[in-house]
């Protein structure tokens, strides 16, 4: 069964590769990436933040990196901002922690601020959640740029 994001990509005729990871594989994710010949620096994590001026901010950063709050606040124009509680994340995105996907969030909330770390500009392919824990997609960066309007920015420490 396909996720809503996968169904949307097929409807729009956007090429992607579905990736599934069982619980054991999630525990040994780096090994699985190597087996599937996926550059770990092309794997995205989608973070949901709450700013005092902009409201919900969706930040997409490399899986192995940490978000720099100060840089993110400067880009968003917020004085205060950070990670809200899980209840807020679920209510604001419709996705549980670990399943947030920028494609799915944008389809429901095009008014949110979407920021993507500038390091992804150099990548041909990106791997990101497809909206369910253990489910991801591999998609061309150029296709991602066409379906989710976002700003590239230096977001990591």
PLM feature spans:
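Extended, low-hydrophobicity, polar/charged segments
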Residues: 1-157
